A protein has these predicted regions:
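Intrinsically disordered, low-complexity linkers and terminal tails enriched in Pro/Gly
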Residues: 1-4, 85-91, 274-290
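Tandem repeat scaffolds
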Residues: 164, 171-284, 298-302
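Intrinsically disordered, Lys/Arg-rich low-complexity segments
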Residues: 290-296
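Context-gated lysine
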Residues: 35, 289, 300-301
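Hydrophobic scaffolds flanking metal-cofactor catalytic centers in soluble metalloenzymes
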Residues: 1-127, 132-148, 152-158, 162-173
Length: 302
């Protein structure tokens, strides 16, 4: 996947630790302590690095290893605020912390738009996608005041409609594709399932067993993959899959990924032996589990 001129890959070394300060989190399975928005994490060093980075999952902070800012951190730090940190210019801190999550959302949309422009079957909408990408890039490049004035929900909805059209053009090549948009597949037994071209936009797949499943050309925008088993699954051509979704899931050495994404460091280097799929997997429910907030960046928005 190509990316636009803005860097959409996180570069923590060029960021002022914004995700460790701007965002709140609550003590629970993802974080060991409570932290209010705008308060530096107790593990954040004076050089804006994490003091327990190599031990986050072992010390009660797995949520930190899941989060991905799509490069918003370094953009806000080095471009929007010209390289002056919130410690150097404390009067700018509150505004910087407000701007960061807005830019993060815009960068996420840029990621999706850039990916959609690589889909050959979506050529009929490439012109609209390119214009949307340019507009989103313009919004993210604004001043702090301009960024805070962006109507993100309205812009996201307009982009979402374009992405859906692109997705439908690509997935049309797959006959008898499954329709699970927004479905409750919590803990579903989908081991070895043929989900090629499936619509899984916004689906709740928490703790679902997708080991050995074929997810090529499946639309995964906003799918909640927390603790989903992706061992041996084929995600090589999955649509709109993000690093945050992979980070939240469980995979192994046999999980096949798109070239643009990295294998999470906490995944094992070995491959799971995949027995035959158990029968009787439950059908999806139509209701949805409530979405938790916080820093984890769990992308269930469509």
């Amino acid at each position: 996947m190509s990316v636009p001129s803005l860097n959409l890959v996180s570069d923590c070394g060029s960021c002022f630790g914004l995700c460790c300060v701007a965002l709140p989190f609550a003590a629970g399975t993802d974080f060991a302590v409570n932290k209010a928005a705008g308060t530096p994490c107790r593990n954040l060093g004076t050089d804006f690095t994490c003091g327990i980075h190599e031990r986050l999952r072992d010390t009660g902070f797995p949520g930190c290893t899941v989060y991905d800012c799509f490069g918003a951190g370094q953009h806000v730090s080095q471009v929007t605020f010209g390289g002056r940190s919130w410690r150097e210019a404390p009067e700018s801190a509150a505004t910087m912390f407000e701007v960061f999550p807005v830019v993060r959302q815009l960068h996420e949309l840029l990621w999706y738009l850039a990916e959609a422009l690589t889909f050959a079957p979506a050529r009929p909408v490439h012109g609209e996608l390119r214009r949307a990408l340019e507009e989103t890039e313009r919004l993210a490049a604004g001043t702090p005041e301009e960024i805070l004035a962006v109507d993100v929900p309205a812009h996201r909805q307009a982009v979402a409609e374009l992405l859906l059209r692109a997705s439908e053009l690509v997935r049309a090549a797959v006959p008898r594709r499954a329709e699970h948009r927004g479905a409750d597949l919590f803990g579903a037994r989908l081991r070895g399932a043929d989900l090629r071209g499936a619509n899984l936009r916004g689906a709740l797949l928490v703790a679902a067993d997708l080991a050995g499943a074929d997810l090529r050309l499946a639309d995964l925008v906003g799918a909640d993959l927390r603790d989903a088993n992706l061992a041996g699954a084929d995600l090589t051509e999955a649509l709109f899959l993000t690093q945050a979704q992979l980070n939240a899931a469980r995979g192994d050495a046999a999980t096949r990924l798109p070239a643009a994404l990295q294998r999470p460091a906490h995944w094992p280097d070995t491959a799971e032996a995949l027995p035959p799929a158990p029968g009787g997997g439950r059908a999806p429910r139509t209701s949805r589990k409530p979405q938790s907030g916080g820093r984890s960046g769990r992308p269930r928005r469509r």
